Every structure is written in C-alpha cells, then in structure tokens.
C-alpha cells in the first residue's frame, strides 16, 4: 500500500509538470533576448541595476521618513525664494532678537569677565564674587518655580557641601586610588536595585543625570540589537516619553517610533503593538511622563515585551524616588511598575530630584548584568592601555556621588516616606481644586507630583504669562498647548498651594473677560513655535536660545522669559 507522502507527491505531479514547462519557456525567453548582448554588457547592466536598487532602498528606508525629508526640502526651497524667503527671514530675525533680549538676565550695571585676572584673587574675594553671582538667581527659595529645586533645605545643603568637600578630588575612574568612592557608588546602585525590587542579578550604574541614564539604556539595547542582526534599531516610545530618547536615536544612529496617547494621556498599548517591527530594539514606558505627570500602563506594555522578546525600559527619572515610597506613604499605585513586572529589563531614576541629591546624579538599573554589559565601552588596543568605562564620561566628580550617598543615608526610608507623603498630599489637593476652576482642565489622571493644565476657552500660554507676572515659573508644553507645575518638597513645606490656587483663579478670571485675546511675549513665541510647520525653523530659534546661554555680549534686557523650555 503506497504511503501518504507518495500519494501526495503523485497528486502534485501535474502541477510540477506545468511549472517545469513555464520555467523552461521563461528561461528560453530570457536567453533569447540576451543573445544580442555581449557578456561584458550583461555584467555591466547587472551591476548598474543592483547599485540602483540598493541606492533606492537606502534612500526610501532611512531613519527619517521620506515624507519628512520631502517637507524639509520644500521648506528649504521656499526660504530661498526672493520675496517670500526675505519676508520669512525678516520675521525670523525679529523673533531671534526677541529671544536674545529675553535671555539677557544681566543687570545694566554688570559686565562679564572675559579674561583671567592678571593677579589671582584671594579666597575671600573669590567667595565675595560668587556671592554676587548667586544673588542674581531668581527667588526659588519662595517655592514659586516648577520643579527645578527639589529640597533646598539649609541643613541638608550643609551636609551635601561637606560630603562633596571630603571627596572633591576623587574620581571613580581610579577605583584603586579611591576605593571608598567605589564602595559608595556600589552601595548607591544596590540600594536603588532593592527599592525597585530587583533580584540578585539586578545591577546598574551611576550617571550624571536622567538624559545620560536614558542614553545608556538605549546604547545597551542598540548593541544588543546589532548582535541580533538588526541594522537600524528602533526605539518604540510613547509620544510623551522624554526627548532624551530622540537624543539617543540621534547620537546612536537609531530610529525612534513615537506612539500616540489615549485621551487619558497614557500610551495607547494597541498602537504600540502595531508599531513593533522586526527592527524594534526596545520599548519604553514612563512613570510618570514629564509633560502631564501620567503613568503609562507598565504591566500591559511588559506583556508585549515578553511576547515579542523585546527589552522594556521604564523611565522613572522624574518620579522614581516617589513611586517606590508611595505605598508606605499611604498612596498605593494601581499597578506595579518596577522589576516585579516580568518584561521590565531596565529603569532610569534621578537621585537629584526626589532623592534630594545635588544636581548631576542619576541611576540606570538593569534586571540582569547581561543587559548592562552592552552598555559598557571597551577599547582593548589603545596605546595608553586597555580603556574601559561604564558610562559616557571618563573622569567623573566623586564629590557628587558622595553627596548622593549622604542624602540617601540622611533621609533613610522613613524620611523619604514622610517627604513623599507631604508632596503627594499637596499635589492631590491642588489637582482636586484645579479641576473645579471654570475655564481650565487637568490633563489625564496624574497620580504623582506633576499637574498639567489646558483650556478649551483661551490660549493657555496667556495663563502662563500672567502667572509669570505674579512671580511664578511654570513649564510650557506643546502638542497640545498646555502648562504644568511640578510640586516638590520645597512647595510642600512652604505651603504655597493656597497662594498658587489664588493666583490661578485671579488670572483665569481676568483672561475669561476677553478669552479670545492674543498672547504676547514669550507665550506668543512658544505658541508660534508650536504652530510652525517648518520644524527646522523652530530648531533654528532654539539654537538662538542655546547660543544665548554662552553669550557674553551685553544686550538690552527684555521681559522675563517664562515657561522655561528646559526640563526639571
């Protein structure tokens, strides 16, 4: 009795014969047309067409989309047109001047030091000069700035200064010379791993800030993707994820795929699933995201990470040292967010925010050392010896790590729980009151310390302008237009919530008398930047802002620049 395989083969015999006939005809047709060409011509045409196909593929499938490049080219050509281009440039120059004037914080009677003094100054003279510089700062001590300074408490400052001083000359690059500093950094990482419920194989690194922490995670997953054969690794991140992911994509030759949000300003998990491709190197969640203070659904995204075997990074730079204490503070979160969630492979958390360490201190943590190894840079062939560094920097200030360790030890678990309790209590009170003010609304359901406001009745940047006039410094956001206030321990202890609400109510009442009025000042510039289709022009204006930071030219001072574009 014939086998099943033999019967199936016999059934397909007619089709195989038909296929053979057509393949023979195709072969004869091609050979017939090639007889009129010499062999060298066939080879030349094959090479040319191969190169054209490769060029076409690379041209179409670049990290930046074809449509985006087409728009840039059109805008560039438009700006070169005689009449239209001149008008655009005139308006652009005026806006640049406005930004430069608003960036001039130097008083009229002050000048910049542009050369070394011929004779060195005494210690007292240097300190007196620095005191003059510090007096130029805005009065952040009053608790009117969004985020920025997260404690500022005098006794803590004294402790941090002393800790930094004791390690001022130390450098983690030389663990053999500074073993105490190595111990400090190892302890900081292990404490953080414990707080985020990492297992025995969890690990991490101390970095200079949230941006570097994010960059390091992206670099690790890029190299992991390279090992898997992915040539153009993609970062799939929510629209609200920090701009540092764009910076990582730019620095490391990756492509970022932004995923839309739901009405509650959380990442749309279905859209994220659709965005996953064979080139996806990592997924991203925020806890919370910077613009609106909303926590992404980490467990749901983690399921995608497990299903498709893709690393998941949780960006907790802003709220990391709040969320780990929320439950003990009496404000438990609805879903887990850390290494307890299967699929979470890395977390970034800033100790220089709600960890109350000095600026320049952050952490990137991994669930397993196998991921961290991809972050490291090692050069085995340098003439100066084998060069290996865990993060971007080579030399780093040991004093910052010492001060970070001091802050962790000084607060302890109870101190952090109490601080979290004060901050969240203040934030929840503000949120409930702001939701009841007619003319504005709160974005999403912020559960931590950031509250974002919008309006359906007027340009929200007008509210930012009026609050600036009252001495507040809020952050301006875009897509959609909004502003936010980040509550810190300084705000909670200064009890500024009542005054903040009073000023918001007064400002909204004033605006609602003429809700359609146009925004002026920096609010208008920010609004214009959001509606400008040519994003290269916006980037050009942003460069003016960055240039101004290092300018030593004396410029006539304009009105105060509100809604700082920088993150906390």
Curated annotation (Swiss-Prot):
Phosphoserine carried by residues: 564
Catalyzed reactions per annotation: sphinganine 1-phosphate = hexadecanal + phosphoethanolamine; sphing-4-enine 1-phosphate = (2E)-hexadecenal + phosphoethanolamine
Effect recorded for residue 317 to S: Almost no sphinganine-1-phosphate aldolase activity
Subcellular location: Endoplasmic reticulum membrane
Sequence ranges on the Lumenal membrane side: 1-40
Positions carrying 3'-nitrotyrosine: 356, 366
Pathway: Lipid metabolism; sphingolipid metabolism
InterPro entries per UniProt: GrpII_AminoAcid_Decarb (IPR050477), PyrdxlP-dep_de-COase (IPR002129), PyrdxlP-dep_Trfase (IPR015424), PyrdxlP-dep_Trfase_major (IPR015421), PyrdxlP-dep_Trfase_small (IPR015422)
Top-level taxon in the UniProt lineage: Eukaryota
Keyword Cell wall biogenesis/degradation found: no
Pfam family for this entry, one: Pyridoxal_deC
Cytoplasmic membrane side: 62-568
Enzyme nomenclature, EC number: 4.1.2.27
GO cellular component terms attached to this protein's record: endoplasmic reticulum; endoplasmic reticulum membrane
Membrane topology: Single-pass type III membrane protein
Similarity-based family: Belongs to the group II decarboxylase family. Sphingosine-1-phosphate lyase subfamily.
Name this polypeptide is given: Sphingosine-1-phosphate lyase 1
Source organism: Homo sapiens (Human)
Gene this protein is translated from: SGPL1
């Amino acid at each position: 009795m014939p086998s099943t395989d033999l019967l199936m083969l016999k059934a397909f015999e007619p089709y195989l014969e038909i296929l053979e006939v057509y393949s023979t005809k195709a072969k004869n047709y091609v050979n017939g047309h090639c007889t009129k060409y010499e062999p060298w011509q066939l080879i030349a045409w094959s090479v040319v067409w191969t190169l054209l196909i490769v060029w076409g593929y690379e041209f179409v499938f670049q990290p930046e989309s074809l449509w985006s490049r087409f728009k840039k080219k059109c805008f560039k050509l438009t700006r070169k047109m005689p009449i239209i281009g001149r008008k655009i440039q005139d308006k652009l120059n005026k806006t640049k001047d406005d930004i430069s004037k608003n960036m001039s914080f130097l008083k009229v009677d002050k000048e910049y030091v542009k050369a070394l003094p011929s004779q060195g100054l005494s210690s007292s003279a240097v300190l007196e000069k620095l005191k003059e510089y510090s007096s130029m700062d805005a009065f952040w001590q009053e608790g009117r700035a969004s985020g920025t300074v997260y404690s500022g408490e005098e006794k803590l400052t004294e402790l941090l200064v002393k800790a930094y001083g004791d390690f001022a000359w130390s450098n983690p690059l030389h663990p053999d010379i500074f073993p105490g500093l190595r111990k400090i950094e190892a302890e900081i990482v292990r404490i953080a791993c414990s707080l985020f419920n990492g297992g025995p194989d969890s690990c991490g690194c101390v970095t200079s800030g949230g941006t570097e922490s994010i960059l390091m995670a992206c670099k690790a997953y890029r190299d992991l993707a390279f090992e898997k054969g992915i040539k153009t690794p993609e970062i799939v991140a929510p629209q609200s994820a920090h701009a540092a992911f764009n910076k990582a994509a730019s620095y490391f030759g990756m492509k970022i795929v932004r995923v839309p949000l739901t009405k509650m300003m959380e990442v749309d998990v279905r859209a994220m699933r659709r965005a996953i491709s064979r080139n996806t190197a990592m997924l991203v969640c925020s806890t919370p995201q910077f613009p609106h203070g909303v926590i992404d659904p980490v467990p749901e995204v983690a399921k995608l990470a497990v299903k498709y075997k893709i690393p998941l990074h949780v960006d907790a730079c802003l709220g990391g040292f709040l969320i780990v204490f929320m439950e003990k503070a009496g404000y438990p979160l609805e879903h887990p967010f850390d290494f307890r969630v299967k699929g979470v492979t890395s977390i970034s958390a800033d100790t220089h925010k709600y960890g109350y360490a000095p600026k320049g201190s952050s952490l990137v943590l991994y669930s397993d050392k196998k991921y961290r190894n991809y972050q490291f840079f090692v050069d085995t062939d340098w003439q100066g010896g084998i060069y290996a560094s865990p993060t971007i920097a080579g030399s780093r200030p040991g004093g910052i790590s010492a001060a970070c360790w001091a802050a962790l030890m000084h607060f302890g678990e109870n101190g952090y729980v109490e601080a979290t309790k004060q901050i969240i209590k203040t934030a929840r009170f503000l949120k409930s009151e702001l939701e009841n003010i007619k003319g504005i609304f709160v974005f999403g359901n912020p559960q931590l310390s950031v509250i974002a406001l919008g309006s359906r009745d007027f340009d929200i940047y007008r509210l930012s302008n009026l609050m600036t006039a009252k001495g507040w410094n809020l952050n301006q956001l875009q897509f959609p237009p909004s502003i936010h206030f980040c509550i810190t321990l300084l705000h909670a202890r200064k009890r500024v919530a009542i005054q903040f609400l009073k000023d918001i109510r007064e400002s909204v009442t004033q605006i609602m008398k003429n809700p359609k009025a146009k925004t002026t000042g920096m609010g208008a510039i920010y609004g214009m930047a959001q509606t400008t289709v040519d994003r290269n022009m916006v980037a050009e204006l942003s460069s003016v802002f960055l240039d101004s930071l290092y300018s030593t030219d004396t410029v006539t001072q304009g009105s105060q620049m509100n809604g700082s574009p920088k993150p906390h």
